[in-house]
């Protein structure tokens, strides 16, 4: 339960803000909460506390956060653009100050990462980043839990990500490097992860002795991989680029031929929703090496660990 003590009163905006030990503590707490639920143990330490959830992007993230808060004994309140004045001139700072009068924690899923940072700056409550265009730390924590559950270690594990260098790739770079995995990202030229995330992961890799690779060759990334990860080629807000992206990313499809380069017992991960026939074939997505639905389930436990730790 060290995570509950060490993160009390902190915001959860990016894994860049957390040490290796703090991330491992969060994962241990998530695993403990998962075991409690599996055993049917009622655990409600957040009774009397309310979470507000702000969504500027439609998402299934609401389900896992809301269920998690309820299971911990608290309440969750969903807010979209129609419930707030953000789209009609109210500043993020004012919204933060107002909501601070009512709730103890807020989860926001938005486009600009700056909005999350500004919300945290002006709020007297804790803030959690449900997703921005730059980062997806809650998903990355669930991914780490999924990866860890199989071998109970990160040492000697190679994670390969193939596809768009988006928010998921940014978060995974940092997450993998911090827990001691080798990580390789393969993406088309011009679609690489953000420079600051690559540089941060490389700095961590130098300290931990792990390899961080960004390449344009999917075979280089997947060679000898223990875990293979991909995401959609066209994210929300990029619909006008869809036709172009389908052409550019076609060589980066995770298919039966590509996964031959990985270890035979590789696991396939995807943050969902998936487009079978685009970034991944149905054979890989629905095959015996796929753990995508277990991965989705782990969002609940990872997010419960975050909520319990910061409140």
Swiss-Prot record:
Reaction equation(s) it catalyzes: carbamoyl phosphate + L-ornithine = L-citrulline + phosphate + H(+)
PANTHER family xrefs: ORNITHINE CARBAMOYLTRANSFERASE, MITOCHONDRIAL (PTHR45753), ORNITHINE TRANSCARBAMYLASE, MITOCHONDRIAL (PTHR45753:SF3)
GO CC entries: cytoplasm
InterPro entries: Asp/Orn_carbamoyltranf_P-bd, Asp/Orn_carbamoylTrfase, Asp/Orn_carbamoylTrfase_sf, Asp_carbamoyltransf_Asp/Orn-bd, Orn/put_carbamltrans, OTCase_ArgI
GO terms assigned for molecular function: amino acid binding; ornithine carbamoyltransferase activity
Binding residue positions for L-ornithine: 167, 231, 235-236
Principal location listed in the UniProt entry: cytoplasm
Pfam families attached to this UniProt entry: OTCace, OTCace_N
Functional pathway: Amino-acid biosynthesis; L-arginine biosynthesis; L-arginine from L-ornithine and carbamoyl phosphate: step 1/3
This protein's name: Ornithine carbamoyltransferase
Keywords: Amino-acid biosynthesis, Arginine biosynthesis, Cytoplasm, Transferase
The family this protein is said to belong to: Belongs to the aspartate/ornithine carbamoyltransferase superfamily. OTCase family.
Protein location: Cytoplasm
E.C. numbers: 2.1.3.3
Keyword Amino-acid biosynthesis attributed: yes
Gene from which this protein is expressed: argF
GO biological process: arginine biosynthetic process via ornithine; citrulline biosynthetic process; L-arginine biosynthetic process
Positions that bind carbamoyl phosphate: 85, 109, 136-139, 271-272, 299
Role played: Reversibly catalyzes the transfer of the carbamoyl group from carbamoyl phosphate (CP) to the N(epsilon) atom of ornithine (ORN) to produce L-citrulline.
Organism the protein comes from: Geobacillus stearothermophilus (Bacillus stearothermophilus)
